[in-house]
Swiss-Prot record:
Keyword annotations of the record: ATP-binding, Cytoplasm, Disulfide bond, Nucleotide-binding, RNA-binding, Transferase, tRNA processing, tRNA-binding
Upper classification of the organism: Bacteria, Pseudomonadati, Pseudomonadota, Gammaproteobacteria, Vibrionales
Protein name as catalogued: tRNA-specific 2-thiouridylase MnmA
UniProt cross-references to PANTHER family, sorted A to Z: MITOCHONDRIAL TRNA-SPECIFIC 2-THIOURIDYLASE 1, TRNA 5-METHYLAMINOMETHYL-2-THIOURIDYLATE -METHYLTRANSFERASE
Coiled coil: none
Cysteines joined through disulfide linkages: 103-207
Organism name: Aliivibrio fischeri (strain ATCC 700601 / ES114) (Vibrio fischeri)
Gene that specifies this protein: mnmA
The reaction(s) this protein catalyses: S-sulfanyl-L-cysteinyl-[protein] + uridine(34) in tRNA + AH2 + ATP = 2-thiouridine(34) in tRNA + L-cysteinyl-[protein] + A + AMP + diphosphate + H(+)
Region (Interaction with target base in tRNA): 98-100
Length: 374
């Protein structure tokens, strides 16, 4: 085992069990470990779903238990400028963005890494993400071999989908200790070590904004624009409060349950399309409706982990949303900025604004933003 005692790692301490165990494991591996807690949202600190104070207290308790120093940093301005404004613009345009991916790109692996470098003199940063990475030898690096990002060992928790915007240079500076473990093992280690976060539930909801009623939250920043819900034939069957509150393939929240379709069809209703020009939500019946199906997609804002654009058709797999089963597909380059993706089998609810992330077996190649379905 290599001597890590001269290498400093700054761990992103979120106040959760994954970052807590990451810090412990790195300590056990001999690194000089320090923690850094990020505060990235200040709009409604006093509301009941803001857990920043509790999370900081838990992070501090874990660091005290492990005997490591905890730094704090406020990235709220960077989060607003580089993540949240994009999030709002995409919703305004009728698309469904994924702010967690942008948060990883702009905050956790950019602003955080820069602060860890410039202020804390870090050799590495570490996060509690469920991904793995390769460690090329010095000889391999000299021959141009770059670190690769791999899926997490726990397929149910794998978070590589959210990290596809990392470059191989960022991967080289990052450690992911829990990526080599399954979640129950992480909780077991936390309990064995007496860490306060051992039984703390996993956070869900928008990155750094927490768990809250999404419609109510979005309505604080974007004015609602109610309109009709129609069938593909143009029959008005209900009202929506705003296209931004709905995503393709959505079933819940349409409030048209019990409405029968043509010929007395009682199949459930799904969001099939958004007509932005008319501010109309098109609802269809049955998850196999043709409007829900796509043969492929067009993607832009491409990012490849090794920074090498794909120049020729490539057979691989793709995820168009988190925790989706891999979809066999072929990537067809249009140019360095755009690709066409053809699925082996038609897919349901491919959503513009979301990310398409590509894999070759365990390796995450990168991805792009879905512009349209085809």
């Amino acid at each position: 085992m290599s001597d890590n005692s001269q290498k400093k790692v700054i761990v992103g301490m979120s106040g959760g069990v994954d970052s807590s165990v990451s810090a412990y494991l790195l300590q056990q591996q001999g690194y000089q470990v320090e923690g850094l807690f990020m505060k990235n949202w200040e709009e409604d600190d006093n509301e009941e779903y803001c857990t920043a104070a509790e999370d900081l207290a838990d992070a501090q308790a874990v660091c005290d238990k492990l005997g490591i120093h905890l730094h704090t940093i406020n990235f709220a301005a960077e989060y607003w400028d580089n993540v949240f404004e994009y999030f709002l613009e995409e919703y305004k345009a009728g698309r469904t963005p994924n702010p967690d991916i942008l948060c990883n790109k702009e905050i956790k692996f950019k602003a955080f890494l820069e602060f860890a470098d410039e202020v804390l003199d870090a050799d590495f940063i570490a996060m509690g993400h469920y991904v793995r990475r390769t460690f090329p030898t010095a000889e391999e690096i000299a021959n141009g071999i770059k670190p690769q990002m791999l899926r997490g060992l726990d397929s149910n928790k794998d978070q590589s989908y959210f990290l596809y915007t990392l470059s191989s240079e960022q991967v080289a500076r990052s450690l992911f200790p829990v990526g080599e473990l399954e979640k129950p093992e992480v909780r077991r280690i936390a309990e064995e070590q007496g860490l306060i976060t051992a039984k703390k539930k996993d956070s869900t909801g928008i990155c750094f904004i927490g768990e809250r009623k999404f419609t109510e939250f979005l309505g604080k920043y974007l004015p609602a624009q109610p309109g009709n819900i129609e069938t593909p034939e143009g029959k008005v069957i209900g009202q929506h409060q705003g296209l931004m509150y709905h995503t393709l393939g959505q079933r819940k929240g349409l409030h048209i349950g019990g409405t029968k379709g043509g010929g007395g069809n009682e199949d459930p209703w799904f969001v099939g399309e958004k007509d932005l020009k008319r501010n109309v939500l098109i609802a269809v019946q049955g998850k196999d409706h043709p409007l829900l199906k796509s043969q492929g997609l067009l993607a832009s804002q491409l990012h490849w982990v090794d920074r090498t654009p794909i120049k020729a058709p490539l057979s691989c797999t793709v995820k168009t949303r988190y925790r989706q089963t891999d979809i066999p597909c072929t990537i067809i380059p249009v140019d360095d900025e755009n690709i066409k993706v053809i699925f082996d089998e038609p897919q349901i609810a491919v959503t513009p604004g979301q990310s398409a992330v590509f894999y070759l077996d365990e390796v995450c190649l990168g991805g792009g933003i879905i512009e349209e379905r085809i």
